[in-house]
Amino acid sequence: ATSTSTVGGAGSNAHSAYASATSSGANSGYYAGGGGGGRGSNSSGTGAGAGGVGGGGQGEHGSGQAAGTTNTGGGGGGGSGEFNGSAGGSGIVIIRYAV
């Protein structure tokens, strides 16, 4: 059976651990993580939650809890039954330059 799933909400992790570790000093940059993927349907199917705005956290259902790429702010997708969710959205990259 084909199932549908909701789309992830807007990003909520405004300042990730990676951001905290790299956002000081001249010419520094950091990745602002966002929300995780939407929760998939409880029944098996092909639907998968999309990552929230800004990427960020993990999917909220079972096998969909795949983390995004390290240090990029990318988020995991929501699961759908026994299927893995799709990849989350991209993170927001902020770079500061000395003037």
Regions found by a protein language model. Give the residues of each.
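Low-complexity, glycine/proline-biased repetitive segments and flexible coils/loops
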Residues: 1-99
